[in-house]
Swiss-Prot record:
1-deoxy-D-xylulose 5-phosphate binds at residues 125, 151-152, 186, 209, 222, 227-228, 231. This is 1-deoxy-D-xylulose 5-phosphate reductoisomerase. Signal peptide: none annotated. It is an enzyme of class 1 (oxidoreductase). NADPH binds at residues 10-13, 36-38, 124, 126, 215. Keywords: Isoprene biosynthesis, Manganese, Metal-binding, NADP, Oxidoreductase. Pathway: Isoprenoid biosynthesis; isopentenyl diphosphate biosynthesis via DXP pathway; isopentenyl diphosphate from 1-deoxy-D-xylulose 5-phosphate: step 1/6. HAMAP family: DXP_reductoisom. Its cofactor is Mg(2+); Mn(2+).
Length: 396
């Protein structure tokens, strides 16, 4: 029986993780659940899975949760605050940590798990986007196992040789005969929408992804293809890939989740129905396999698999992310922070859909090149970028 800590338990990935655990109750014990401020859902999860600890970032929400759990006669200990969450991520009794807190908020708890040498199921892409080298170095030092949960990175991981899987962050792709890593993306809900209509896109339209069930922020990122841009940055860190070793292709059906091209002409792809429980189950059981609850792919019902080159006029955020990756860690950190501010503003109807890219671009253009040596540097750049983004919003 393995103890699992779920950072971001009330989010989409967290709920999918609990679903996988339901299918494998004899193998996994929920040790701790961590959320933001969703008291009702956290109380329901605690009632069902009975973790030893539960933590909410919001202090008032944590107090309400403690009252509800006491009324339910549950012995789960309720904690709050960043320090407590970091301690849960690094707890000696935890075997596996699902790192699924969205955004920069997940950075420090995930890093705490890395430093503690845990098996980390990495769903928080911002950890590598903002702290790539720091995370890879710390994982190598502590012996932590980094297993990518994002469907694309998980697909690449599965398509690479075993020796590459065992050297996440420093695998020599060329020596292993790998010529290209191919990231696939659906193109989001506006793949065929007229560019003239982009100014009038609403939050409701942007979060209605055609293939995947995701949270609001990541759904908007998928619509702008910033999500694919962040995945591009993350893939470069995870697989030690140069710009020349990366490729992006739009695949509307989301059946092939990504591919690896080899120098002998082979292309190995990982396929499956678009359901996050598949990569979650893979990382939970690695190197073994467990049931995920996902319906098997029915090839008899597949009518077509199509591929399209990305159009940077339609997806300027994707181009921006690729360029930031070439600039370095300061630029990707700034871009990530700007995008969090811009997407939140769009969801709250403060800016138009097209202004997300304008704000992101303004921040990247105005942030000074700064050296990133540690997490303090990252947090400094993150804060600077957020301030520039908020100022830029006043001018849109």
């Amino acid at each position: 029986m393995k103890n699992i800590v779920i950072l971001g338990a009330t989010g989409s990935i967290g709920q999918s993780t609990l679903s996988v655990i339901e299918h494998n109750p004899d193998q996994y014990q929920v040790f701790a659940l961590v959320g933001g401020k969703n008291v009702e859902l956290m109380a329901t999860q605690c009632s069902q899975f009975k973790p030893k600890f539960a933590a909410l970032v919001d202090e008032k929400a944590a107090k309400l949760l403690a009252e509800q759990l006491k009324a339910l006669n549950l012995t789960t200990q309720v904690l709050t605050g960043e320090q407590a969450i970091c301690e849960l991520a690094a707890h000696p009794d935890a075997n596996i940590v699902m790192a699924a807190i969205v955004g920069a908020a997940g950075l420090l708890p995930t890093l705490a798990a890395v430093k503690a040498g845990k098996q980390i199921l990495l769903a928080n892409k911002e950890s590598l986007v903002t702290c790539g080298q720091i995370f890879i170095d710390e994982a190598r030092k502590s012996g932590a196992t980094l297993l990518p949960v994002d469907s694309e990175h998980n697909a690449i991981f599965q398509s690479l040789p075993l020796v590459a899987q065992q050297k996440i962050g420093f695998c020599p792709l060329a020596e292993l005969g790998v010529s290209r890593i191919i990231l696939t993306g659906s193109g989001g809900p506006f793949r065929e929408k007229s560019l003239a209509e982009f100014d009038s896109i609403t939050p409701e339209q942007a979060i209605a992804h055609p293939n995947w069930s995701m949270g609001k922020k990541i759904s908007v990122d998928s619509a702008t293809m910033m999500n694919k841009g962040l995945e591009y940055i993350e893939a470069r860190w995870l697989f030690n890939a140069s710009v020349e070793e990366m490729e992006i292709i739009i695949h509307p059906q989301s059946i092939i989740h990504s591919m690896v091209r080899y120098i002998d002409g082979s292309v190995i792809a990982q396929m499956g129905n678009p359901d996050m429980r598949t990569p979650i189950a893979h990382t939970m059981a690695y190197p073994n396999r467990i049931p995920s609850g996902v319906m098997p792919l029915d090839f008899g019902k597949l009518t077509e698999l199509t591929f399209i080159e990305p159009d940077f006029k339609r997806y300027p955020n994707l181009k921006l992310a690729i360029e930031a990756s070439a600039e370095g860690q300061y630029a990707t950190t700034a871009l990530n922070a700007a995008n969090e501010i811009a997407v939140d503003a769009f969801l709250n109807r403060q800016i138009r859909f097209t202004e997300i890219e304008r704000i992101n671009s303004t921040v990247v253009e105005n942030i000074a090149p700064l050296r990133v040596n540690d997490v303090a540097d990252v947090l400094h750049i993150d804060q600077l970028a957020r301030e520039i983004a908020k100022q830029a919003m006043l001018n849109v």
